[in-house]
Structure formats: structure tokens, C-alpha cells
Amino acid sequence: MTKMIFVNLPVTDLKTSIAFYKALGFEQNPQFSDDTAACMVWSEAIYAMILTHAKWRTFTDRPFPPAGTSEVMLSLALDSRDAVDAMNAAALAHGGQADVNPVQELGFMYSRDLADPDGHLWGAFWMDPAAIPHADPG
């Protein structure tokens, strides 16, 4: 079986969150979606399960983190700097926040961080591995 990751995120408005994630480039998998949850596909190995609070409670009784706090930031590699900028623009246009952290311009890597409507953090980045500076072994 292929190794996959399913990131489970509690959301306050499932329809708003579905529209938000579609705008970022995720596709909805209807086979694993209903009126309490939606499976949003980033790639063959990466999925975001957006869950109503009631559905989330079927998995855990742990409290929801307050908006504006974070325990993880999920980062997605994109094909270009323009794609990074487009993802942040889409986040802003669909109820999220763009540039929640300072933009990073490192020459070989460009990143901008965003938040979904519930405050979950996502990093969008582009990197040119051939341009990564290498330490002098001597």
C-alpha cells in the first residue's frame, strides 16, 4: 500500500472550507465526503480531511485550539513562485489570510504562509534544489 498522510482539520463551516480548499488547488473526493466531512486531495499521497466540529468530536475530546494559535504548519511545494503568489491570492479571496508570516526570499527558495478560514496554517513554497548553497567541506 502507498504511504499516505491524511491531515484532519476541524472547521466551523464545511461549505466555506470546501470552497476555500478548492480555490487553493485541492480536489474533493466525493467517495469520502458527506455533510460532516470532506476529503480534499492535494496529491496521490496527501489529503486534508476537513471535519465539522461534531465529526471531529467522534475522534477526540481534546479542545479545539483557539484561532490565532497553532500546533503545526503544513507546507506544500509548488511548481513556481507565481504559483506561490497565486495560492496566497486565492486564500485571501476565499476567506483566508495571506502572508500570516513574513515572506521568505532566499534565492533558492521562496515561501509565503497563509491561514484557512479557521486559522489553520499552510506554507506555500517554491524551491530550486540546484541553487541551494552548499557548505564548503574544507
Model-based region annotation:
Residues M4-T12, M40-V41, R62-G138:
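Vicinal oxygen chelate
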Residues S17, Y21, V84, A91:
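Hydrophobic pocket/interface hotspot
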Residues Y47-A48, A67, D118:
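Short, hinge-like loop/turn segments at secondary-structure boundaries
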Residues N8-W56:
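Core segments of cupin and vicinal oxygen chelate
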Residues T36-A38, R57, G107-F108, A135:
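Short secondary-structure capping/turn micro-motifs that flank functional sites
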Residues M1-I18, M73-L76, M127-G138:
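N-terminal beta-strand motif that seeds the catalytic metal site of vicinal oxygen chelate
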Residues K55-R62, A131-H134:
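A short, acidic/glycine-rich surface segment
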